[in-house]
Amino acid sequence: LLGLVASAVLRCDDCIKYHLETSYKEGITKEEMMEAMGIATLVGGTIVIPHLRRAYEFWEALEESGQ
C-alpha cells in the first residue's frame, strides 16, 4: 500500500495499476485501498484526484473480472 501511495503522489498511472493489482491479489479490501488513496490525496494534493478516479475504476474492473 505504501507503493500505491507513492505512485499516486508521483501520478504514475502504470505504477498505480501495478500496485492495485498486487494489493488486490494480496487480499487488500476496497476500504483499505481507498484509505491509502485518501492518504495519497492528503500528501499529493488535489492534483492526485484524477488518478484516484482511474484507480477506483481499475479496482472495480479487478473485482468484476475476479482476477
What are these regions (language model features)?
Residues 1-67:
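Hydrophobic alpha-helical segments
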